[in-house]
Amino acid sequence: MKTALLSLILFSCHIWAVKHQAKKCTEDRECEEIWPGSTCQRARCRCPENYVRRKSPSREWVCLSVNDAATGQVGPPLTCPLPDGAGYQVILRGSSTNNLLSPPVLCSSKTNDCETGYECIQGLSPVDGLDGACCPDQITTCAHPIFDHESGTLERWGFDGSECVKFKWDPEKPSSANNFKTKLQCESYCVNIFA
């Protein structure tokens, strides 16, 4: 059963990668599907203001928020794309408990030397000579649990295993990478890779 599921996942990712390989955009909608607020400029998707575009082995590209979602101030130099503005919460950590106090697993975005289920995303600035952190890849992101915070004030979308559902998010509380700004982004990340 595990082998069949792994084969399906790998085949789906291969089909997705072929469909999205170095694709040039022609309209904003194509970019918006991958990252909310992105626009098509000169046949290339551009991230919104206060975001930087970074290469993603599983998604082609992602946008990193320069600002922390909880404080609105400039965020840490290493972060993951999701949750938006709080990606530092889901960086792979160098301990068995994987808590925020453990050091992050650093990597080189040129070699993508992260463990299975993670990919190297170049940070906002290098740390200790390495330019990236190991972040959940597309499949791992979609497999993470949804952290629905009753006290949350921000509406978000998460993949529950079959569809994208709405929930409330509090950026000051622990979260997972399964946290999308829009339903379209959630579907693009999770639902559509198995379609």
Swiss-Prot record:
Q: Which gene encodes it?
A: bli-5
The upper taxonomy is: Eukaryota, Metazoa, Ecdysozoa, Nematoda, Chromadorea
BPTI/Kunitz inhibitor domain sequence ranges: 120-190
Q: Name one Pfam family in it.
A: Kunitz_BPTI
Q: Name one GO molecular function term.
A: serine-type endopeptidase inhibitor activity
Among Gene3D superfamilies, the record links this protein to: Pancreatic trypsin inhibitor Kunitz domain
Which cysteines are disulphide-bonded? 120-190, 164-186
Q: Which species is this record about?
A: Haemonchus contortus
Leader peptide range in chain numbering = 1-17
List the keywords (alphabetical).
Answer: Disulfide bond, Signal
The role this protein plays is: Appears to lack serine protease inhibitor activity in vitro when tested with bovine pancreatic alpha-chymotrypsin and elastase. May be involved in cuticle biosynthesis.
The name on file for this protein is Kunitz-type protein bli-5
Q: Which domain of life is it from?
A: Eukaryota
